[in-house]
Swiss-Prot record:
This is Proteasome subunit beta. GO terms for molecular function: threonine-type endopeptidase activity. It comes from the Archaea. It catalyses: Cleavage of peptide bonds with very broad specificity. The lineage of its organism: Archaea, Methanobacteriati, Methanobacteriota, Stenosarchaea group, Methanomicrobia. The 20S proteasome core is composed of 14 alpha and 14 beta subunits that assemble into four stacked heptameric rings, resulting in a barrel-shaped structure. The two inner rings, each composed of seven catalytic beta subunits, are sandwiched by two outer rings, each composed of seven alpha subunits. The catalytic chamber with the active sites is on the inside of the barrel. Has a gated structure, the ends of the cylinder being occluded by the N-termini of the alpha-subunits. Is capped at one or both ends by the proteasome regulatory ATPase, PAN.
Amino acid sequence: MVEAFKGTTTVGIVCDGGVVLASESRATMGSFIASRTAKKIYQIDDLVGLTTAGVVGDAQALVRMIQAEARLYRMQRGEPLTIKAITSLLSNILSARRYFPFLVQLVVGGVDKMGPKIFSLDALGGQIEEHDIVSTGSGSPIAYGVLESLYKPGLSIQDGSVLCVRAVHTAMKRDSASGNGIALVRITKDRYEEVPTSEVEEIVRSL
C-alpha cells in the first residue's frame, strides 16, 4: 500500500466575539517530510472554517463534500447552515463510513446566529462542542499544555491569535510530524480573515 500524507498540529479557541484557528504546514509520509506547505485550514462558508488532521486525501475529500453542501443549502434556503448543522452533517458522513473510515480529526469553528462555536469530530463521527479550547493531530498533547496553561475565558481575538500561534509553535519544537510555517485564521461576526504570513511571523518573533 502507498503510504499516505499525514501529520499535523491544529488548534482552535473561542474568544470574545469570535474564534481563532491555527495549524502548521508540514505533511509527512512516515519519517519523510512530503510537503512544507500543506493546507490544513479551509473556509467552509462565509464565517465557518475547518481544520484537518490525519490523512490529507481523506481530509480534502471531506472538505469538498461539505463546501458543496453548504453552498447548495445557501442557494436553496437563502441563509447559511449553522455551525451545529455543518458539524452534524460531517458526523453523519463519517459515521456512514465507519467500516472504511476517513482517517481524520476535524475541528469546525466559526460564528453564526448563536455566537462563536467550535466543535471537534473524530474519524467515526463522534462530535463534541468545545466551549473553550481544542487541539488535534500528533502535536496536540504539546499544544494542549500551552492552551490549558494560558487560556482564559473572554480572551480577545488578538490575544487569542497570539495564544494559538504559541501553542502551534511549541508543538512544532517537539513533534516531528509538525513544522514549517503557521497558518492563522480569525473569524468574527463580520469577517473570515486569513492572517498574512508576515503578521504570523511577527507574532512568532514576539514569543
